[in-house]
C-alpha cells in the first residue's frame, strides 16, 4: 500500500527530474510504504535510470524493512520497459514501482528472468 503522501513525493520528484527519469527507494514495512528516499539518476536519461543512493540505505533491509525500487517514465506506460527488464540485475528480487509522470499513474511489478508480474497496490 502506498499512502497519498508518499505518492505525492514520488510525483513531485518525477516532475522535478522531467524530462529525465527520476529514481529512488520506497521503504516498506509489512507491505505499507513508510517513506521515500529520493535517489539520483546517474545517467540523466528519459529512457533509463541508474539509481545512485547512499550505501547505508541498503542496510535498512537488515532492520526489517523491504525496499522497493522506484522510477518514473516521463510519458510512457508505468510498466517495465525492455531496458528495465534487461538491467534489473540485483534489484529483480525487490518490488518495482513505476510512475508515469504525465498521467500520475502508478503501478507495481515484480521482475524475474526477463518478465514482469504486476503486484496490487492496495
Predicted regions and their residues:
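Conserved beta-strand-loop surface patch within small alpha/beta domains used
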Residues: 1-66, 75-122
